[in-house]
A protein has these predicted regions:
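Carbohydrate-active catalytic/glycan-binding domains of CAZyme proteins
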Residues: 1-294
């Protein structure tokens, strides 16, 4: 895999344009193939904007399968921002959001919620169903929730769900059906979490760049270092904002190799460019401290 990364011409692997933005990547690595899921923001000929959860696959981060839409064309839902894909109870489960813009809003309105979508084979996906992240609180009373992410804690047999609400909110579950609310911490959107030697690193979107936190128990977190911005200062395509990091662990020569997928907007920031031009990039590290990019 290291040779694949070294042979990359650019870290900018999926490029947006005046009608398409590619945002919020989530990545599953299976049998030598990257399954890259992301938000497609598509501006139609009449200027109407629709959002989808989409997929492409690649073995070399250079040649990609055609982008496949996995969710419906409906601004009341705008299924998007896949957090990650986990395997549980015989099925692959993807957590994702609705980003409701049915009235022409720029950002998702208060109807936005978080969902799970299931697949037996990674080829076809069932209709998403909502996550009731606060126990018996009805869906209509949960408030705006976006950007979910799931991680399993083996020693306690507990699933941890992180999502954007009042900072980074946190719920837990034993079965991915019934959840208990655990509270929230300071932090941004697009959380991604990885287990490293029994500790946990959280990556989240700061105002610009990818913030890093550490925890030994998935409940108490502290900030680590400065936000990651990789080669942003030299990348016109990401000079406006670099964000939404998704971490994946591989192995290289028996040692960990971490890939960080993210999206960038530029040269203007997201106050100017939001529904167009955003693209997906990649950086990599052997220790989560020293990063490489092209």
């Amino acid at each position: 895999m290291l040779s694949v990364l070294e042979d990359l011409k650019s870290s900018h692997i999926i490029k947006g344009d005046e009608r398409h933005a590619f945002r919020d990547p989530a990545v599953l690595y299976k049998d030598g193939v990257f399954y890259i899921y992301f938000t497609l923001v598509e501006t139609e000929a009449d200027g109407t904007v629709y959002m989808y959860t989409t997929e492409t696959r690649t073995a070399d981060l250079t040649n990609f399968t055609p982008i496949k839409k996995l969710t419906v064309r409906d601004r009341r839902y705008n299924f998007s921002s896949p957090g990650n894909v986990v395997f549980h109870d015989g099925k692959y489960k993807m957590c994702l959001q609705t980003y409701c813009r049915e009235n022409g809003e720029k950002f998702g309105n208060d109807n936005s919620r978080i969902f799970i979508m299931e697949s037996a084979d990674l080829e076809s996906w069932d209709t998403p169903y909502p996550i009731l992240a606060k126990g018996d609180t009805p869906l209509s009373e949960l408030g705006r929730m976006i950007d979910p992410y799931l991680i399993y804690e083996e020693k306690t047999d507990v699933w941890h769900l992180f999502y954007k609400q009042n900072g980074v909110s946190h719920s837990t579950s034993h079965d991915l059906k019934h959840f208990n609310y655990e509270g929230f911490i300071d932090g941004g959107e697009n959380v991604s979490v990885i287990d490293v030697d029994g500790g946990y690193y959280m990556f989240h979107s700061s105002r610009n760049g990818i913030g890093v936190k550490f925890s030994s128990d998935l409940h108490n977190w502290r900030d680590v270092g400065e936000p990651l911005t990789f080669g942003q200062k030299d990348w016109p395509w990401a000079m406006g904002r670099l964000t939404a990091g998704a971490i994946v662990e591989l192995s290289e020569g028996g040692k960990p190799l971490y890939l960080m997928f993210f999206h960038g907007t530029g040269p203007e920031d997201e106050s100017v460019i939001f529904d167009t031009h955003a693209g997906i990039g990649v950086a990599w590290s052997f220790d989560l401290k020293n990063w490489f990019w092209k």
